[in-house]
């Protein structure tokens, strides 16, 4: 399924049904009193989250949603039927924004969360309502009111406990694929990942965490260069970021430069992202010998100064993956984030 994280839709609530003017007409009662019923209320438009969606692609093809109008009132004081509501399903993590005012109506982060986005029109009154001691045969009835109309902007921000980031071809997708159920594409060329992918990492039959893989970042990503910039927002809800680094490069100075490229892009894009816990994951240790690893790591750590956590792994050989999964789980568990 194609990934789409922005959409604009039009929602139209149903109009209220008009009241009716009518009079009782039965055998032997040719001139009965008023018996016009009220109309029915218009249907409402709701948005509700579901777990089986992770894209807004459906709204690329269907953009207008209209609830049913209320029925007009009937004679014999019968009320018109209320218009049926409609419930539009959206992925968890969708922000609902009024397109005209930029007001955030709701940030939908819970399963089965339901929010009213367009209220149906109020019913009109039948002429029975206007009977009085001074007006025995009222002919007046009122019309139902129009339902609300709104233009909504939907913005999906995926929900994951952990997010991965790094340069293209650093091994992010291989890591995510080998520790979770994610079916990410893997190949030895840059920009293999073209859209965010979520994977579930199972700890046991009850406990798990969700990890997000976004396209690789390059210098200038925060200003729109490359593929990853448009997906950086999907890291905003993550509690922990894993910075995946290719340690197999010949010149360790290039490694240092690449690390700072990613950190600078985070800071430029969003200080919230830059201030999140970031663990450094040095990947591709299978491509160099232990002496080179230790020499490079020592030089890198000296240049970086204090860092929160670091790991040495080979994502493709699955070396060190159990350790990092355990550390992530402990981190999330200790902070009551699971």
UniProtKB/Swiss-Prot annotation:
InterPro entries with a match to the protein in the record? G_OBG, GTP-bd, GTP-bd_Obg/CgtA, GTP1-OBG_CS, GTP1_OBG_dom, GTP1_OBG_dom_sf, OBG_GTPase, P-loop_NTPase
Q: Where in the cell is it found?
A: Cytoplasm
The UniProt annotation places GTP binding at: 166-173, 191-195, 213-216, 283-286, 314-316
Protein's GO biological process: ribosome biogenesis
Q: Which GO terms describe its cellular component?
A: cytoplasm
Annotated GO molecular function terms are: GTP binding; GTPase activity; magnesium ion binding
Q: Can you give the residue ranges of the Obg domain?
A: 1-159
**What EC number(s) would the UniProt record show?**
3.6.5.-
**Chain segments annotated as coiled-coil in the UniProt record:** none
Query: Which residue range or ranges hold the OBG-type G domain?
Result: 160-333
Binding-site residues for Mg(2+), renumbered to this chain: 173, 193
Cross-referenced PANTHER family: DEVELOPMENTALLY REGULATED GTP-BINDING PROTEIN-RELATED (PTHR11702), MITOCHONDRIAL RIBOSOME-ASSOCIATED GTPASE 2 (PTHR11702:SF31)
Which NCBIfam families did the record assign? Obg_CgtA, PRK12297.1, PRK12299.1, small_GTP
Q: Which family does it belong to?
A: Belongs to the TRAFAC class OBG-HflX-like GTPase superfamily. OBG GTPase family.
Function description: An essential GTPase which binds GTP, GDP and possibly (p)ppGpp with moderate affinity, with high nucleotide exchange rates and a fairly low GTP hydrolysis rate. Plays a role in control of the cell cycle, stress response, ribosome biogenesis and in those bacteria that undergo differentiation, in morphogenesis control.
Q: Assembly and partners? A: Monomer.
* Protein name, UniProt field: GTPase Obg
Species name: Buchnera aphidicola subsp. Baizongia pistaciae (strain Bp)
């Amino acid at each position: 399924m194609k990934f789409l994280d922005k959409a604009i839709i039009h929602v139209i609530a149903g109009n209220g049904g008009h009241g009716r003017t009518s009079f009782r007409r039965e055998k032997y009662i040719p001139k009965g009193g008023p018996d016009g019923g009220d109309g029915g209320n218009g249907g409402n438009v709701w948005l509700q989250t579901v777990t089986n969606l992770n894209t807004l692609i459906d709204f690329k093809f269907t953009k207008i949603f209209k609830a049913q109008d209320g029925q007009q009132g009937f004679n014999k004081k019968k009320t018109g039927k209320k218009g049926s509501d409609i419930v539009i399903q959206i992925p968890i993590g969708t922000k609902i924004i009024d397109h005209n005012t930029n007001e955030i109506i709701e940030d939908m982060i819970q399963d089965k969360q339901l929010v009213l986005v367009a209220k149906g029109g109020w019913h009109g009154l039948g002429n029975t309502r206007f009977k009085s001691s001074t007006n025995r045969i009222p002919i007046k009835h009122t019309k139902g009111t129009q339902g609300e109309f709104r233009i909504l902007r939907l913005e999906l921000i995926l929900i994951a406990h952990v997010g991965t980031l790094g340069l293209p071809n650093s091994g992010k997708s291989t890591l995510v694929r080998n520790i979770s159920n994610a079916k990410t594409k893997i190949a030895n060329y840059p920009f293999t990942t073209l859209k965010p992918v979520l994977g579930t990492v199972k700890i046991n039959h009850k406990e798990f965490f969700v990890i997000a893989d976004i396209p690789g970042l390059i210098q200038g990503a925060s200003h729109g260069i490359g593929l990853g910039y448009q997906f950086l927002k999907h890291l905003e809800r993550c509690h922990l970021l894993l910075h995946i680094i290719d340690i197999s490069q010949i010149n360790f100075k290039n490694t240092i430069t690449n690390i700072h490229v990613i950190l600078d892009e985070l800071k430029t894009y969003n200080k919230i992202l830059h201030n999140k816990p970031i663990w450094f994951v040095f990947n591709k240790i299978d491509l160099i010998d232990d002496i080179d690893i230790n020499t490079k790591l020592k030089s890198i750590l000296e240049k970086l100064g204090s860092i929160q956590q670091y790991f040495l792994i080979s994502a493709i050989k699955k070396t060190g993956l159990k350790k990092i999964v355990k550390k992530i789980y402990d981190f999330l568990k200790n902070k009551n984030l699971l």
